[in-house]
């Protein structure tokens, strides 16, 4: 966890971008939910290597995200199943890839927010971390 500069102040960034499984996503969401924050934002990339169960596993995480997040951004074809299972007010945006998601997420973050970035390595969520921290890291 580290603080990043955003327009008008700072936000908390939780970088869990290296790997993702159903259990680790749920654990990450619990960490996000425990943070004192104005809003809790979840940036989620596909969990890869789930086989035929991939769509259902992604959709099942919507219940957790709905309870623990205020806003959800997704990228990749599998995360679309989670995204569309959420109530419309929680949908920040769905994008084809992390490169497309990064600027929209950056623009959405406000002072006092806590942001969890999570996805399988192949989802390239590290691109988002770089976009959020480039020359902006506070601590």
Identify the meaning behind each predicted range:
Residues 1-139:
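ATP-dependent carboxylate-amine ligase
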């Amino acid at each position: 966890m580290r603080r990043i500069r955003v327009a008008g102040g700072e936000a908390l960034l939780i970088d869990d971008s290296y790997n993702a499984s159903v259990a680790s996503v749920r654990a990450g969401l619990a960490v996000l939910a425990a943070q004192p924050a104005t809003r809790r934002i979840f940036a989620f990339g596909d969990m890869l290597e789930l086989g035929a169960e991939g769509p259902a596993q992604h959709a099942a995480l919507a219940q957790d995200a709905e309870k623990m997040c205020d806003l959800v951004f997704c990228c990749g074809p599998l995360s679309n199943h989670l995204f569309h299972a959420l109530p419309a007010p929680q949908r920040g945006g769905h994008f084809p890839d992390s490169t497309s998601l990064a600027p929209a997420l950056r623009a959405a973050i406000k002072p006092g927010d806590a942001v969890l970035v999570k996805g399988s390595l192949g989802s390239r969520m590290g691109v988002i971390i770089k976009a959020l921290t480039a020359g902006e890291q506070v601590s």
